[in-house]
């Protein structure tokens, strides 16, 4: 009996399939016992016989109808997983993809099916899956390395075919996969946190050359803040010098918000309008200042020589006179012992003018801080170097005259 002959007159398709192609019929129906019995008696050539209806072999029939057990039996009996039909050059993978059977596809791939083989119109299994809108089959193929950008003989990709057939969801899925495939070089690039050597993003909170607030706090020394209320000119002084790092050119501590600049009741007014006495700020003298432009005296800035007018180095205290000269006073003791003067003029937390003997020697970190035993306002200002950065010299020069005038006014009342 010639299996390749055309349908005979007087026989229906079902009768002809049962009589002339029993292996094909068993694979179509998933009749595993009948298939096993036929495989034991049928010659090996029957495994590659093509029917007269579609030109398929038994393994193509099993793949089209999703009969995984039949596929296994056929391959075990010697059928090729890459068997190509004579008429359309299609493999079982093409047929399983078009039928929408991802389980059969996965198994065929595992036993060696070529998922990128093109048929007579240049289509691979993923094109067939797109034609039928089988997203599951597409996913199975892509997971095993199927090429989604291949074009058929008409120049169409799988996404184009899905769109043409009206499977918009499938088409969009393929387009997304195609974009990911074309842009996969971004996987270690800018879209996924790449270019790590290009420097931190200032808007992402990345690490920069500035030390973090937590690092400074852990060391017991507060760090400068740039967002303080216009205190960009207020530079912490230590041993008559300043640090060359621009990060330390701003006030560290966040001062209290000033609701009324004329009340002179907040710490901010004392710091911005007060005078320097014995290396500390005097609140009483600060309250005497009125009628002056608070905006111009908003910041106490460095003089060009690196010293705030009225504030001297730790070893020697000087006061500016009305003619602009400096009048030396007696030498001061170790400034670390004078760490309570800030609260000796009306502060409710005023306790001691000298550092208590039971407090450990803070070294150089409390030269301009204060200690009152409660720990709620004690500050420690980090030691600074002796070089003023050139970038801030212009701003310092502009505010220097205002600071000198304010200091003279406080001392002489003129």
From Swiss-Prot:
Entries under SMART domains matching the protein: ANK
Which segments carry the ANK repeats? 18-47, 54-83, 88-117, 121-150, 154-187
* Record InterPro entries: Ank_Repeat/CDKN_Inhibitor, Ankyrin_rpt, Ankyrin_rpt-contain_sf
Keywords (alphabetical) are: ANK repeat, Repeat
Supply the PROSITE patterns for this chain: ANK_REP_REGION, ANK_REPEAT
Example of a GO biological process term: protein targeting to chloroplast
Show the segment(s) annotated as Disordered.
310-332
* Superkingdom per UniProt: Eukaryota
Q: Which Pfam families match?
A: Ank_2 (PF12796), Ank_4 (PF13637)
Q: Name one GO molecular function term.
A: chloroplast targeting sequence binding
User: Can you name this protein?
Assistant: Ankyrin repeat domain-containing protein 10
What organism does the record attribute this protein to?
Gallus gallus
User: What does the organism's lineage look like at the top?
Assistant: Eukaryota, Metazoa, Chordata, Craniata, Vertebrata
């Amino acid at each position: 009996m010639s299996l390749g002959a055309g349908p005979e007159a007087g026989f229906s398709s079902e009768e002809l399939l049962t009589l002339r192609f029993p292996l094909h019929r068993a694979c179509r129906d998933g009749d595993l016992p009948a298939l096993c019995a036929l495989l034991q008696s049928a010659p090996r050539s029957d495994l590659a016989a093509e029917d007269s209806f579609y030109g398929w072999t038994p393994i193509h029939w099993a793949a089209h109808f999703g009969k995984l057990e039949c596929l296994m039996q056929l391959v075990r009996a010697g059928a090729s997983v890459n068997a190509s039909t004579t008429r359309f050059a299609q493999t079982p993978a093409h047929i399983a993809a078009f039928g929408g059977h991802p389980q059969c596809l996965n198994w065929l791939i595992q036993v060696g099916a070529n998922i990128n083989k093109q048929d007579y119109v240049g289509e691979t299994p993923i094109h067939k899956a797109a034609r039928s809108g089988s997203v599951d089959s597409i996913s199975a193929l892509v997971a095993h390395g199927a090429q989604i950008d291949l074009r058929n003989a008409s120049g169409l990709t799988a996404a184009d075919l899905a769109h043409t057939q009206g499977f918009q969801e499938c088409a969009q899925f393929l387009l997304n996969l195609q974009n990911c495939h074309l842009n996969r070089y971004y996987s270690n690039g800018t879209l996924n946190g790449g270019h790590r050597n290009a420097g931190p993003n200032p808007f992402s909170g990345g690490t920069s050359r500035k030390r973090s607030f937590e690092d400074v706090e852990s060391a017991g020394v507060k760090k400068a803040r740039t967002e303080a209320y216009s205190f960009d000119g207020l530079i912490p002084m230590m041993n008559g010098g300043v640090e060359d790092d621009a990060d330390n050119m701003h006030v560290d501590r966040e001062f209290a918000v000033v609701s009324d600049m004329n009340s002179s009741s907040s710490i901010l007014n004392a710091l911005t309008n007060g005078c320097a006495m014995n290396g500390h700020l005097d609140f009483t003298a600060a309250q005497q200042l009125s009628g002056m432009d608070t905006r111009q005296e908003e910041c106490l800035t460095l003089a060009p020589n690196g010293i705030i007018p009225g504030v001297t180095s730790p070893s020697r205290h000087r006061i500016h006179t009305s003619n602009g000269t400096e009048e030396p006073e007696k030498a001061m003791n170790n400034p670390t012992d004078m760490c309570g003067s800030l609260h000796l003029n009306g502060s409710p937390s005023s306790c001691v003018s000298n550092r208590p003997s039971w407090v450990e020697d803070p070294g150089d970190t409390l030269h301009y801080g204060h200690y009152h035993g409660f720990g709620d306002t004690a500050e420690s200002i980090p030691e600074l170097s002796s070089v003023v950065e050139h970038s801030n010299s212009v701003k310092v020069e502009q505010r220097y005259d205002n600071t000198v005038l304010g200091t003279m006014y406080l001392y002489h009342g003129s």
